[in-house]
Amino acid sequence: MLVIPPGLSEEEEALQKKFNKLKKKKKALLALKKQSSSSTTSQGGVKRSLSEQPVMDTATATEQAKQLVKSGAISAIKAETKNSGFKRSRTLEGKLKDPEKGPVPTFQPFQRSISADDDLQESSRRPQRKSLYESFVSSSDRLRELGPDGEEAEGPGAGDGPPRSFDWGYEERSGAHSSASPPRSRSRDRSHERNRDRDRDRERDRDRDRDRDRERDRDRDRDRDRDRERDRDRERDRDRDREGPFRRSDSFPERRAPRKGNTLYVYGEDMTPTLLRGAFSPFGNIIDLSMDPPRNCAFVTYEKMESADQAVAELNGTQVESVQLKVNIARKQPMLDAATGKSVWGSLAVQNSPKGCHRDKRTQIVYSDDVYKENLVDGF
């Protein structure tokens, strides 16, 4: 047996309420539909009446309208005076009409939804911006500018121009609020100190960079001076080699020991063997004398090296029988061993060599012209 409760349950009561609301809405909709249908029929009748009227020209219509206005049946239409300018946005017009409502909420896709309470909290959290004077002038500079009585101290050139006017009202306001909000003043002081520390660090870094650049420039100058000195030394060595009698080869740039030997190199124009023997025989026994007339030079070989050194010391740069002589020890010393007597075959080689004697021992054969003539006659 099913037991049905006498009253309705909560769900049934809620459904009944909804049903009643729907009925009321349906009745309202029907009433609105009736009103709209009646308005459309009236508009259609007006349109029909207007369409049934005869078509008139603009000139006749304007004359009829003027007569009606004069009679007072129709009032003249007043032209609206519109202010020419830029169009205002609808949101701005809404703000101007209802300033108490505040800004109309609009959908902004790239902005998080912020309520008015959150906006107020954020504005309270944000640090207040400093004035332009505070951002450039620190508190210590302001105290220096002020005198002991709180007045501006007179400095050099204070009376030359008009007095400077600073925003002291802001100072008074900040002093009044400082007692009420000490944490703000502390945060400002901390920010000032941080800014000063940053400026000091930047200045130190700049000074270090300048010192480094100066040291680099000094090192570069030193290197340049060293290179210049080296180049000068090289040039001096080259000049010395060029000025000397024989140029030193590039493969042996180091200093050489003085030459030693018994063979001399003699340079002079129009030299003769008799002149050379007469000039060089007083210093020692000459074992070889060879000449090279195309080059204006000769080679004189002594028996001893001491005599060669003495001849160089006394005859180099002198003039003998109007011939300027340049005497030096020869680079090549082929007769040194033979002259000193170290080898047995050396003396023989010197005696029989083509350079050993300046005169050829062979006899020259000379043919007369008569012999040629006789041979020609016999042939024909």
Curated annotation (Swiss-Prot):
Function: Essential component of the NELF complex, a complex that negatively regulates the elongation of transcription by RNA polymerase II. The NELF complex, which acts via an association with the DSIF complex and causes transcriptional pausing, is counteracted by the P-TEFb kinase complex. Provides the strongest RNA binding activity of the NELF complex and may initially recruit the NELF complex to RNA.
Similarity comment text for this entry: Belongs to the RRM NELF-E family.
InterPro entries documented for this protein: NELFE, NELFE_RRM, Nucleotide-bd_a/b_plait_sf, RBD_domain_sf, RRM_dom
Cross-link (Glycyl lysine isopeptide (Lys-Gly) (interchain with G-Cter in SUMO2)): 78, 82
Region (30 X 2 AA approximate tandem repeats of R-[DSNE]): 184-243
Protein name (database record): Negative elongation factor E
One GO MF term attached to the UniProt entry: chromatin binding
Subcellular location: Nucleus; Chromosome
Organism of origin: Homo sapiens
Region described as Disordered: 30-67, 79-258
Domain RRM stretches: 262-332
Bias (Low complexity) ranges: 30-43
Cellular component aspect of the GO annotation: chromatin; NELF complex; nuclear body; nucleoplasm; nucleus; plasma membrane
Phosphothreonine carried by residues: 272, 274
Tissues/organs with expression: Widely expressed. Expressed in heart, brain, lung, placenta, liver, skeletal muscle, kidney and pancreas.
GO process annotations (BP): negative regulation of transcription by RNA polymerase II; negative regulation of transcription elongation by RNA polymerase II; positive regulation of ERK1 and ERK2 cascade; positive regulation of transcription by RNA polymerase II
Comment, domains: The RRM domain interacts with RNA, and is essential for NELF complex function. It is however not required for the NELF complex formation.
PolyADP-ribosyl glutamic acid PTM sites in chain numbering: 122, 151, 172, 374
Keywords, alphabetical: ADP-ribosylation, Chromosome, Coiled coil, Isopeptide bond, Nucleus, Phosphoprotein, Repeat, Repressor, RNA-binding, Transcription, Transcription regulation, Ubl conjugation
Residue windows of the Sequence repeats: 184-185, 186-187, 188-189, 190-191, 192-193, 194-195, 196-197, 198-199, 200-201, 202-203, 204-205, 206-207, 208-209, 210-211, 212-213, 214-215, 216-217, 218-219, 220-221, 222-223, 224-225, 226-227, 228-229, 230-231, 232-233, 234-235, 236-237, 238-239, 240-241, 242-243
PANTHER family (UniProt xref): NEGATIVE ELONGATION FACTOR E
Cross-link Glycyl lysine isopeptide (Lys-Gly) (interchain with G-Cter in SUMO1): residue positions: 78
Modification after translation, per record: Phosphorylated by the P-TEFb complex at sites next to its RNA recognition motif, promoting its release from chromatin. Sumoylated.
